[in-house]
């Protein structure tokens, strides 16, 4: 019974139709990945390990239409999931070497709406091609761009792990002030839910800290 319950709990519901996949992969340095169940096709955000259990559960939930890769570090087993479910992988062209054959390449720094409810926002900094995904103006999947720092009880971004350009990452963070969202769902670190107003305030505070 416990095993059956565990199977039903994977992926694990966060809120609404957004799930945490578990099965974090060492290929992505243990990064988190997420699943969105959607009537127009399901999404995988970054890649977990390819495991029979998760493969079966994703199939039961309707398969995959898109695999959104925030950046080159977190592709893990995305190619295997793409083959299994005939899904289209989305990654910025600047990070495309990590996902050769990706079906959709994001270019430049302009936001890209794959679907009316899903907006890809390029945020270069951690890597040159890092992007975040905004879903329903509520959930922001942030990869390694943004997380919740539980020690400081504040949004965080880390200069020591910025592989491309910190000033560019700061500018990218500031551009996120144009959007409203309640959830930050990171690749590493803690996720957090705040009111949209509080999230905007915390983001402004973070940008100010990054500029000092």
Regions from the PLM with identified roles:
Residues 23-33, 93-95, 99-102, 106-107, ...:
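Active-site-proximal loop/helix segment associated with metal-binding centers of metalloenzymes
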Residues 2-16, 42-44, 50-51, 56-59, 64-74, 79-128, 161-182, ...:
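Metallo-beta-lactamase
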Residues 70, 77-80, 89, 139, ...:
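Redox- and metal-dependent alpha/beta enzyme cores, enriched for Fe-S-associated oxidoreductases
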């Amino acid at each position: 019974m416990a095993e059956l319950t565990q199977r039903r709990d994977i992926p694990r519901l966060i809120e609404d139709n957004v799930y945490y996949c578990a099965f974090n992969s060492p290929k992505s340095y243990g990064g988190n990945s997420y699943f969105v169940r959607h009537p127009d096709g399901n999404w995988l955000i970054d890649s977990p390990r390819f495991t029979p259990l998760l493969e079966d559960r994703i199939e039961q939930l309707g398969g995959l239409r898109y695999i959104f890769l925030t950046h080159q570090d977190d592709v893990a087993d995305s190619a295997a999931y793409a083959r299994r479910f005939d899904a289209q992988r989305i990654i910025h062209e600047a990070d495309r070497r990590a996902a050769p054959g990706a079906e959709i390449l994001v270019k430049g720094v302009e936001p890209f709406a794959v679907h009316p409810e899903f907006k890809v926002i390029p945020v270069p900094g951690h890597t040159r091609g890092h992007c975040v995904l905004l879903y329903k103006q509520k959930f922001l999947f942030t990869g390694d761009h943004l997380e919740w720092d539980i020690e400081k009880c504040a949004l965080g971004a880390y200069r020591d792990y910025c592989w491309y350009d910190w000033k560019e990452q700061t500018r990218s963070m500031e551009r996120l002030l144009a959007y409203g969202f309640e959830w930050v769902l990171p690749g590493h670190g803690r996720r957090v839910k705040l009111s949209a107003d509080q999230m905007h305030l915390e983001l402004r505070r973070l940008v100010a800290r990054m500029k000092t």
